[in-house]
Amino acid sequence: MAKHVCPWWFGYLMASPLRRLTDDPAKILTPHVRAGMTVLEPGPGMGFFTLELGRLVGPSGRVVAVDVQPRMIEGLKRRAARAGLLDRVEARLAAPDSLGVGDLAGAVDFVLAYGVVHEVPAAGPFFIEVSQTLKPGASLLLAEPKSRVNVVEFEGELQAAGRAGLQVRGRLSMGRMRAALLQK
């Protein structure tokens, strides 16, 4: 699933601790993720949010991080190993046209789609595939950079999510990001 995918080497910059100044994973994720949850993270890069997700779900939870770039997945695995989170973080390589998460049908409690939907070839199929993984009542946090996704494009993503059975539960104020919380 790739339209204009972030280059693999940019993953190192996106995983920088300095990024916490604008995108604090704990602050963003803590209201939505609890111990024991199963979380799906499409487009995790090298795991900036994945590591915090792994800490939040705890030893009884699971994070499935899916990316189309092998080097991103390799970097994520290294970082998860260093953080001692490989027991709960699974990094998968996606196909160009599918996340490859059919085995998660109806099993996911929360999806983090942070800065990724604008990179997929079509939002509709992406949201359909993601929606199929969600349990009834489960949530998806959609966040897109204002510098890459204008208001009209973001609304188009929300409409595509709606057609996939996801309802907007609220808009979130996240600085440089356009964001909404959706629910199945």
Locations of regions flagged by a protein language model:
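Conserved alpha-helix/loop element of class I SAM-dependent methyltransferases that forms part
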Residues: 19-35
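Conserved class I S-adenosyl-L-methionine
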Residues: 37-45
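Class I SAM-dependent methyltransferase SAM/SAH-binding core
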Residues: 46, 52-99
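A short acidic, Gly/Pro-enriched loop at the edge of an enzyme's catalytic core
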Residues: 97-110
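A short SAM/SAH-binding and catalytic strip from SAM-dependent methyltransferases
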Residues: 109-121
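A short glycine-rich, Lys/Arg-flanked "PGG" loop and its adjoining helix->strand segment in the class I
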Residues: 124-136
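Conserved beta-strand signature within the Rossmann-like core of class I S-adenosyl-L-methionine
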Residues: 137-144
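Core SAM-dependent methyltransferase catalytic element
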Residues: 173-184
